[in-house]
Amino acid sequence: MLEQAYQGYTYRLPELPHAYGEQVHLLADPVLLSQLARLCRPEVVQPEITTLVRDIYHSLVRTVVANELPRQRTEVKTRMFESTPRAVWCGDVLDEHVRAVTVNIARAGTLPSQVVFETLVHLLRPEQVRQDHVYMARVTDDHGVVT
């Protein structure tokens, strides 16, 4: 009999209750909140800023993927299969046929989008993931006022 513990499981975000509606998720993750608190401190400088931003976005994209993307049931013959025919893992994993696009808005900083893209190409089929780039700049009038 195949292992069934990982079939049809329910994934739940660690969330704070709120009245913003079902499409808003306020994460209650002590690791992410600790990293965010550290990032906000004025004494934190480069290269730690980049490391924290990268780590935070990596965790956020994994959380979003786990909560929002569809799953499919799969069976995997493990490395132990040569020793026993019972060495088959069966469970729900990410649907590898999902398509994804990340948009890099250069004015807002490129690192978050790059982290999302790199994470998605490792979790999904790379040919199903695309990264688009949008370049933006402020426009000022003759007096230097942003318009």
State what each model feature region is.
Residues 1-147:
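PRPP-associated nucleotide enzymes
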